[in-house]
Amino acid sequence: MLPVLYTGLAGLLLLPLLLTCCCPYLLQDVRFFLQLANMARQVRSYRQRRPVRTILHVFLEQARKTPHKPFLLFRDETLTYAQVDRRSNQVARALHDHLGLRQGDCVALFMGNEPAYVWLWLGLLKLGCPMACLNYNIRAKSLLHCFQCCGAKVLLASPELHEAVEEVLPTLKKEGVSVFYVSRTSNTNGVDTVLDKVDGVSADPIPESWRSEVTFTTPAVYIYTSGTTGLPKAATINHHRLWYGTSLALRSGIKAHDVIYTTMPLYHSAALMIGLHGCIVVGATFALRSKFSASQFWDDCRKYNATVIQYIGELLRYLCNTPQKPNDRDHKVKIALGNGLRGDVWREFIKRFGDIHIYEFYASTEGNIGFMNYPRKIGAVGRENYLQKKVVRHELIKYDVEKDEPVRDANGYCIKVPKGEVGLLICKITELTPFFGYAGGKTQTEKKKLRDVFKKGDVYFNSGDLLMIDRENFIYFHDRVGDTFRWKGENVATTEVADIVGLVDFVEEVNVYGVPVPGHEGRIGMASIKMKENYEFNGKKLFQHISEYLPSYSRPRFLRIQDTIEITGTFKHRKVTLMEEGFNPSVIKDTLYFMDDTEKTYVPMTEDIYNAIIDKTLKL
C-alpha cells in the first residue's frame, strides 16, 4: 500500500513539472482567462445597477478618496483629482446653462492634447452628452464629414486651429451648429468663447438627474478610424465598451502608484480608452504631452517619473533612431503598452533602453475581438487562449486577396485555415462580443459584417486584418486586406516587405504599396523610402539584400525617395495618393529607381524605362 501511495504522491509532485514541459504557457493562459472572466463578471454587475456604473462613477470615487493626488501632468502644470473634478463640474454647468446642452446632445472636440481636453470630456460625461473626437489634422471636406456623421450640435475647438475652423464655418453656420473656441477671446466672427463661461459658474457637484437616461448602450464617444484608405468612419463607443477599453491597462499590471506617460492623441482610442480611462480605473497619474517628440521623450519620462509608456505604430522605432546617450537607461519606465511593434525594433529597444516589459496587443477601435501578448514573446501581437476561444468565438478564414472577399466552399460557407497559414480574422457577433457599428448610416456598419459564415444565419465581425497563428498559439499580424496586393499570382504582404527593406542601413523609414501596371494583372510592388541622414542610396546593396530575403514576386520593382513619409495622427502610413501617382517619372518629382535584374541593382527610373514598361518591351 505504501509504495502505491508514494508513487501517487510522486506523480502529483511531478505533475506541475510535466504540465510546464508539455504546456509551458498553461498557467499564464489560465491566469489571463480568469482575469478576463472576472472583468466580464464585474461589467455585467455594473450594467445591472441603477444607475448603471460608468467610468465617470470611478473618477468621482477617486476624487473623493484621493482628492489631492496628482491626476494630470502637463508641461509644468499638475492638476489633482479634486481640481479636475471641480473644473469638469464647471464645464458641465456652463454647457448646460449657457449652451443649452442636455443629455444625448453630441459635442465635437477639435483640439490637441492638453488638460482642457480631459476636463471637457469629464464635463460632457456628467451631462450625459457623447463626445466626437475630431482628428486635429483633418481639414475641409474631411472635417465636415466627420462632424456631420456624428450628429453633433456644438463644436468646441482650439483657437490654434482657427484657420481650419474658419474654412468650414459658413457650412456649419448654415446647418445651425454652434461653434466655440476653448478660450476667453475670439478673433473670428461667428465663433464664441467657452472658457469665460466656464470660469463664471459654480464648481459644485452636478446632479445625477442631468444624466439619468444614460445606459450601458448609450453612446459615450465617437472615435474615428484613421482614414488611410478614404474618409474616416465614426466608431460608436458606448459605456459598455468603455469598460473593456480599460482591460488592457489592468492586464498589463498598472497600479495606483504608476505614472502613465502618453504622447498619443486623445482623439484616438489608445490614449483615451486605454491610457486615460485605464489611469482613472486604477487611480494612477496621467502625464500628457501635446505631440510626440523623439528628442524629448526620455527627458519627459525622467521629469514626470513615468513608469508606464504608451506606443503605437512606429513610435518606438523613432526612439531607437535617436543618437545614443549615456543616460539612455536612466529612467523608471517598467511597462510599455501598445501595438504595431516590429520584432527587430522590440529587440533593439529593450537592449538599448533596459528591461522594459513590453505588452503588445491586437485590437481595433470598433472591433469585438482583441488579443494580448501576455507572455511577451517578441514579434507576436497576441496569444490565442483556448479557454478564451470557447467564450469568444473567433476564427481565421481563407481570404482571396485579388477578389477582396473570403473564400467559400461548394456549400457557400467560409473555410478555416490551419495553424501556420494566414487568414482573415473574424469574430462572432453575440451578446458577449457585440459590434456597435458606426454613426451616420447603416451602410458602413453592414459592410463590416459577414453573414452565413459557417451556417445559415450566423453573423461575424470582419476585422479586415490578415493574421497567422503558429503551433504555439502565438498570433502574428500579416497585413490589412486592403494593403496586401497580388502580383504574378501571389499575395504580397506590405508589412513583410517593409520589414525586410527597413533592415538596410541607409533606410530610415519605408512605406510599401502596390501600383497598377497597364496591361498587367494585379499590382506590382513599390516602396517609398526616407533616407537616414548622412547616408547615400546604394542600389546594389538593396538589391542584394531583398534578393536574399524576398521571393521575386514580392520584391519592390520601383522605389521613390522622399524627404518625409506621410503618416496619419496614429503613425500609420498613407498609401492611397502614392498608389494613384504610380511610377511615372514625368509626373513624380521625387527621385525614382527601377530594379534592374540584369545589372542586379536599382537604377534611376527614366522616361525610356517607363515607356518600355508601358509598351511591354521591358518584361516585369
From Swiss-Prot:
It is an enzyme of class 6 (ligase). GO terms for molecular function: arachidonate-CoA ligase activity; ATP binding; cholate-CoA ligase activity; enzyme binding; fatty acid transmembrane transporter activity; long-chain fatty acid transmembrane transporter activity; long-chain fatty acid-CoA ligase activity; phytanate-CoA ligase activity. Gene3D superfamilies: 3.30.300.30, N-terminal domain of ligase-like (3.40.50.12780). It holds the Pfam family AMP-binding. This is Long-chain fatty acid transport protein 2. The gene is Slc27a2. Residues 1-4, 128-267 are lumenal. It is a multi-pass membrane protein; Peripheral membrane protein. Keywords: Acetylation, ATP-binding, Cell membrane, Endoplasmic reticulum, Fatty acid metabolism, Ligase, Lipid metabolism, Lipid transport, Membrane, Microsome, Nucleotide-binding, Peroxisome, Phosphoprotein, Transmembrane, Transmembrane helix, Transport. InterPro entries: AMP-bd_C, AMP-bd_C_sf, AMP-binding_CS, AMP-dep_synth/lig_dom, ANL_N_sf. The chain crosses the membrane at residues 5-27, 107-127, 268-288. Liver and kidney (at protein level). PROSITE patterns: AMP_BINDING.
